[in-house]
Amino acid sequence: YAAATGKLKLSAPASDYLPALGGGKFDHISILNLGTYTAGGLPLQFPPEADNNQHMISYFQQWKPDFAPGTQRLYSNPCLGLFGYLTAQSLKQPIDQAMEKNLLPKLGLKHTFVKVPPSQMSLYAQGYGKDGKPVRVGPGAMDSEAYGIKTSASDLLRYVQANMNPAKLESAVQRAVSITHTGYYTVDGMTQGLG
């Protein structure tokens, strides 16, 4: 949505949206590299010492790529988390607000959340840990940006319908849907879109 409204350029360096990342590797890693997991080898998860909001930016500042941006795809929550974080920066809102107050309502999703509100917790699915105790996605650095939204079955159907037939959506949302349907990076017969 940020790209469709002209607030985010997928080709721009990541450092354009977060000056603290400027003067180094993120001047050569694009927003698109982050959105397609081709930033240069960010790990699957943040290391424990950086898995919090206080240390995540310094982690990115100190991180060293394993390969050139755009040359290899490696799934990474920090990579997609930074993509979401910079997208929110471009919209000048926290990601939760950008999603829950702007984008999700434009898609007609009334029971979809980045952070499930207390009034909906009884409907929020859970898994079980090795100890048999209930578990859900835990908090961590860029969790809202990387771990996805929580939705109801009826909203999931609305989301699928919006993606199959976006003609009823406002024009910026139609463009956003189209951007997410575009393949940007191909490897081993698979084409990667955003996220």
Describe each PLM feature range:
Residues 1-11, 80-88:
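Active-site SXXK
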Residues 9-24, 107:
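Short, glycine/proline-biased beta-turn/loop segments that scaffold the active-site neighborhood
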